[in-house]
Structures are given as C-alpha cells and as structure tokens.
UniProtKB/Swiss-Prot annotation:
Family recorded in the similarity comment: Belongs to the EutC family.
Domain notes: The first 19 residues target foreign proteins (tested with eGFP, mCherry and lacZ) to the BMC both in situ and in E.coli. The cargo is only detected by Western blot in broken shells, strongly suggesting this protein is normally found inside the BMC and not on its exterior.
This protein's name: Ethanolamine ammonia-lyase small subunit
Region (Targets protein to the BMC): 1-19
Domain of life: Bacteria
Enzyme nomenclature, EC number: 4.3.1.7
Keyword terms of this UniProt record: Bacterial microcompartment, Cobalamin, Cobalt, Lyase, Virulence
Organism in which the protein naturally occurs: Salmonella typhimurium (strain LT2 / SGSC1412 / ATCC 700720)
GN (gene name): eutC
Inducing factors: Part of the 17-gene eut operon transcribed from a single promoter, induced by ethanolamine and adenosylcobalamin (AdoCbl, vitamin B12).
Pathway(s): Amine and polyamine degradation; ethanolamine degradation
Annotated signal peptide: none
Location(s), subcellular: Bacterial microcompartment
C-alpha cells in the first residue's frame, strides 16, 4: 500500500465520520530557495537539559566543511547523527544523551498504567496470568493467557460474537497507550460503527502479550480482533504504538503469519488519527476476504 492509497483511505474514512481531513503543513521554504540554517552548536554544557529539543538538535561535529548540510540532516531525522567524536570516542554530551534516553526507555518499560487512568477512560480492565511487571518481563508465555477472573469478566460483561473486537494492552510501553489513546480509539470505534460493523466492548488488558488476542477472539467469538499494544521503546522513541489485527483467531491454530501489523503509530510516525482510518479499512477488507496476514490478497 503506497502513500497515495493511504491518503485516499484516510480521506474516505474521515469524510464518512464527518470529520475534516488534516492537511499537511506548508513547507517553510519556497521551492528552490536555500533554507536558512542555524550554525552547528559544538559547545558542550552540563546545564543543558538532555531531554530538551535543544539537546536533540545539538550538533557536535567541530569545524564542519558544510555546516548547512549537517543542520538539514539533523532536522530531517530523530536518529543520532552529527554527534561528533573526540578521537575514537563519542563526545561527552552525546554519551550523556545516550544514557539519558536509555534510562527513559527503561522507565517506560517498568512503569504501570495507572488504574485511575483506565477508570477515567471507562474501560473494563482484565489481566493476563501475570501478577506483576517483573513476572511480565521474565515469563512472556503467561502474558499470552488470560487469568480465570478475566475470562469470567469477558463472558459476563462483553458483547458476544461481534464483527470486530478492539482490545488495548500496555505491552512494553505505558507511554504509548496513555499518549495516543485519545487520538486513536475514539475515531477507530466511530469509524468501525460508521462502516456498519458490530463492534464489541472495548477493554484494557494489563500485562498482555500479542498472542493473548487469540484467546480473546475465541472466547468472544469475534470475527476480527484488533489489539492496540505498546511497542518496545527505542532510545529515541517511547510512545510508539502497534496494531495487531487477526481474522477469526484460535489459540491452537493461529500463527504469527496470520496477523497483520501496523506499527510506529505516534505523532512522529504514523499519526494516530490516520492509523485509525487505515485500521478501519483493514478490518473491512478482512471481513470481506475472511482472511488476515499473509492470507489476504492485496
């Protein structure tokens, strides 16, 4: 699926929901005009906030031949470029930023989604067989199965046999859920209902792994299960969300190739609202083709 097809899907779904299609920002420079580039900053400072935009834009290459090229490269990516070297070693500020980002990523993995936040969203909360974060990280197999209490809760409080069941889980990034929730779940549910699909009761699974959606789909009799789960955080991005969609999942027979994944959902990647529109279209095609993953025809 190319960018033009994605834009057409987003435009169609957003129009059916009665919402305006977000327009891309106008370029800051005219075509052919030379961009105004700031001079690279090579001075290291212990007072600089390592998580600030200034620190991320820092250029550590001393006496560059083409400063404007470095500035444009630094603006074009969130990757660690233009950090410079001190002999064979990274510069102090580059190393400190690396350590700070690494610490932030570890914090994201270890944090818990607050119960108050889940209640504020009006979501039913269930758990996998995991009881705490340490067990979640060391026993991924238990994160693929619902607890007995969770099974009872789903059977008693959720709509049975829906066309589409939407599930939210913390996964390996708490920030991915809390940062993107309001911009992806409401338009996703609205788009599915606007498409005339029977949508199940959305709920939150604490300590869930991707394969847990197979058991959920089997218990509820869902035709399509959509799992929104936090991705493993990287050094530069801890708010990335993934969508794993599968048609008619079964614990015993569904394999990873049966899933369709849309990853990198966040403000710096695929915008959550745009992702919601693409997921709606994906769910419709899964129901039409009665397939998902590699079994879908393009």
């Amino acid at each position: 699926m190319d960018q033009k097809q994605i834009e057409e899907i987003v435009r169609s779904v957003m129009a059916s929901m009665g919402q305006d299609v977000p327009q891309p920002a106008a370029p800051s420079t005219q075509e052919g005009a030379k961009p105004q580039c700031a001079a690279p900053t090579v001075t290291e400072s212990c007072a600089l906030d390592l998580g600030s935009a200034e620190a991320k834009a820092w250029i550590g290459v001393e006496n560059p031949h083409r400063a404007d090229v470095l500035t444009e490269l630094r603006r074009s990516t969130a990757a660690r470029v233009c950090t410079g070297r001190a002999g064979p070693r990274p510069r102090t500020q580059a190393l400190l930023r690396f350590l700070a980002d690494h610490s932030r990523s570890k914090d994201t993995v270890l944090k818990e989604v607050p119960e108050e936040w889940v209640k504020a969203q009006g979501l039913l909360e269930v758990r996998s067989e995991i009881s705490d974060k340490n067990l979640y990280l060391t026993r991924p197999d238990m994160g693929r199965r619902l607890s007995p209490e969770a099974i009872d809760a789903l059977k008693s409080q959720c709509v049975m046999n829906p066309d589409v069941q939407v599930v939210v889980s913390d996964g390996l990034s708490t920030d991915a859920i809390t940062a993107n929730y309001e911009e992806i779940l409401p338009p996703l549910l609205a788009g599915l209902k606007q498409a005339g699909l029977n949508v199940g009761t959305p709920f939150f699974v604490r300590y869930g792994r991707v394969k847990i959606e197979d058991q959920i789909g089997e218990i509820l009799g869902a035709k399509v299960v959509i799992l929104l789960v936090g991705e493993r955080p990287g050094l530069g991005q801890s708010e990335s969300l993934s969508c794993y969609a599968v048609y008619s999942p079964r614990v015993a027979t569904t394999v990873e190739a049966d899933r369709t994944c849309i990853s990198n959902i966040h403000q710096g990647g695929t915008p959550p609202v745009e992702a919601a529109a693409v997921i709606v279209d994906l769910a419709k095609r899964m129901l039409e083709q009665k397939a998902s993953g590699i079994n879908m025809t393009r």
